Amino acid sequence: MRPVSKIERTVAPFEVVSPYQPSGDQPAAIAELDRRIRAGEKDVVLLGATGTGKSATTAWMIEKLQRPTLVMAPNKTLAAQLANEFRELLPNNAVEYFVSYYDYYQPEAYVPQSDTYIEKDSSINEEVERLRHSATNSLLTRRDVVVVASVSCIYGLGTPQEYVDRMVPLRVGDEVDRDDLLRRFVDIQYTRNDLAFTRGTFRVRGDTIEIFPVYEELAVRIEMFGDEIEALSTLHPLTGEIISDDQHLYVFPASHYVAGPERLERAANDIEKELGERLTELEKQGKLLEAQRLRMRTTYDLEMLRQIGSCSGVENYSMHFDGREPGSPPNTLLDYFPDDFLLVIDESHVTVPQIGAMYEGDASRKRTLVDHGFRLPSALDNRPLKWEEFQERIGQAVYLSATPGKYELSRGDGFVEQIIRPTGLIDPEVVVKPTEGQIDDLVHEIRKRTEKDERVLVTTLTKKMAEDLTDYFLELGIQVRYLHSDVDTLRRVELLRELRAGEYDVLVGINLLREGLDLPEVSLVAILDADKEGFLRSGTSLIQTIGRAARNVSGQVHMYADKITPAMEKAIDETNRRREKQVAYNKEKGIDPQPLRKKINDIVAQIAREDIDTEQLLGSGYRQAKDGKGAKAPVPSLGGKAAAKGAKSAKGKAKETVPTDRPAAKLAEEIEELTNRMRAAAADLQFEIAARLRDEVSEMKKELRQMKEAGLA
């Protein structure tokens, strides 16, 4: 039993809120999943075609089972998309987002061939870190929790029991020494700052203490009368407005890696002991340089730990802080869940192999560091879970995929199928065309689509070909972008949003246009060199790529090939099987396929529960959407000029429209006002807000230039 299973959590029912009811294959799939899980089956596979509503089916399944759930996705982009969907479907429950908090991460490494040591370098996204803390906080305080996570959830996270033991419970009427309370806040890594009140800090004003938990958008006020807690309240950190009066609150540590003084000293002693043993071993092997290197580095780290409680690369000593035996698995997010949690693995054909590969990739780099005296052997225990350890920590699992892998299919007793789309949308028609003249044919097809305000995805085999093709399209005046591995995660999400919004028409990529991308505006997927067998043109890859056109009524897939390979045949046959089943269902029910209408949301903005003062900072440029707790969460919208522009032309091409709904002088004033707001937001460290304001200012400046060129200014 997990230690945290004994913790009392608030119990509230999972409840799906949706204007739609299960339809198509969904009712049967939900009932069968519910039956199998309740019957105790450990592994269940849901083979769900693209666009059949697997996310909604999962939400209804969670509603039936009423169990805390971990949903794993293969990357941050899909995790964000899933979290948005679950937030909409389960607005009254805690839907959390747990991914790596690094915007940039260069791991510590050593290259023996060139004697090059690369120091660890990273940049942490504070908002994502808050969301990680919010996830663990929800898991330890309530049962109605769905956490959407990337593979980051199998990496070490600190001991949940220590995290719980060091939390500070606050209750009205409790007797507590004020100075002792302040010391406890410092012990759990909160910083006193009476001037700048930000997350992870507290301030003291007479008998009033205010603390801003790292996992919240709101702060907590503690009013003392002598040594008694007289009142507790939740307040807005900027305005000071009281949001609620409370009787009982918890303050969790500001770090998942919190350690008390006694634990710190024990860890330091263990590190010293290991250092002595390792130095003896290296000296016996004649590795004097490595021994000296290790002695200098570790002694410096020990001094830092004893003086300030932390050091650079402290995670490499996690085995000693956790009190684990060498080789034992680390604590991870999985250990924060109660025993009966349910695991859902989305796009399992990608995610399952990814989980299995994490350990070896991490270990090979660290072995080199240990062998050359840069780290103690215990650094190898700061690692992700091995596949066997992961399996030991999960109970029942549901695997979701349009193309389940061999592992998933071998585990379950057959699969639950969900092929029919409630919207009546039919799988795209697959057309095989010769490679001769393929680019000219593709240009012709692109022009046909852009005339109808539809989008196109083009997938190539090599980065060079994708770059050359993008350049060629640009020369022809086609609005095109190139999605590649060098584009960071958040920019990748933004590129997909821009494609849907019509800011360009064609997206060219290699292996980034597959699993889970939800793009209803795409009516054509072009697969170049479809007959070149390999990983990118396997049957599974082709079925996934074909699925990108399955959300559009007039969806088509053009495969450019000179022969039909077994992989192509498999993909085409499976697509035709699904088409026939959907056509028969539509005919039986009298359904006319309807286009999928889906809001074009800013995924990155929606995933975070933004500050309540966003509305004041941004004014009317943003509409408001309620989150599950009734607090307002801003959703970016095109206001004023952008709305007019977007309504007239979804393309967003500057030359097509020059809005004239306000004079240039008024527009210039608005630009100046928004610029001032942008600078103020940046000064207050509200960087997400500042970035959105910057984009809006950029659009308005572009409009002003158009007005001047048209002689309207």
Swiss-Prot record:
InterPro entries for this protein: Helicase/UvrB_N (IPR006935), Helicase_ATP-bd (IPR014001), Helicase_C-like (IPR001650), P-loop_NTPase (IPR027417), UVR_dom (IPR001943), UVR_dom_sf (IPR036876), UvrB (IPR004807), UvrB_inter (IPR041471)
Subcellular location: Cytoplasm
Biased composition (Basic and acidic residues): 653-663
Residue ranges of domain Helicase C-terminal in the record: 438-604
Motif (Beta-hairpin): 101-124
Every UVR domain range: 668-703
A single BP term in Gene Ontology: nucleotide-excision repair
GO cellular component annotations of the record: cytoplasm; excinuclease repair complex
Region (Disordered): 624-663
Broad class of the protein's primary localization: cytoplasm
Keywords, ordered alphabetically: ATP-binding, Cytoplasm, DNA damage, DNA excision, DNA repair, Excision nuclease, Nucleotide-binding, SOS response
Stretches with biased composition (Low complexity): 639-649
The Helicase ATP-binding domain, residue ranges: 35-421
SMART domains documented for this protein: DEXDc, HELICc
SUPFAM superfamilies, sorted: C-terminal UvrC-binding domain of UvrB, P-loop containing nucleoside triphosphate hydrolases
Residues where ATP binds: 48-55
GO molecular function ontology, one term from the record: DNA binding
Primary role: The UvrABC repair system catalyzes the recognition and processing of DNA lesions. A damage recognition complex composed of 2 UvrA and 2 UvrB subunits scans DNA for abnormalities. Upon binding of the UvrA(2)B(2) complex to a putative damaged site, the DNA wraps around one UvrB monomer. DNA wrap is dependent on ATP binding by UvrB and probably causes local melting of the DNA helix, facilitating insertion of UvrB beta-hairpin between the DNA strands. Then UvrB probes one DNA strand for the presence of a lesion.
Family indicated by similarity: Belongs to the UvrB family.
PANTHER family: UVRABC SYSTEM PROTEIN B (PTHR24029:SF0)
Domain statement: The beta-hairpin motif is involved in DNA binding.
Name this protein carries in UniProt: UvrABC system protein B
Species per Swiss-Prot/TrEMBL record: Streptomyces avermitilis (strain ATCC 31267 / DSM 46492 / JCM 5070 / NBRC 14893 / NCIMB 12804 / NRRL 8165 / MA-4680)
The gene coding this protein: uvrB
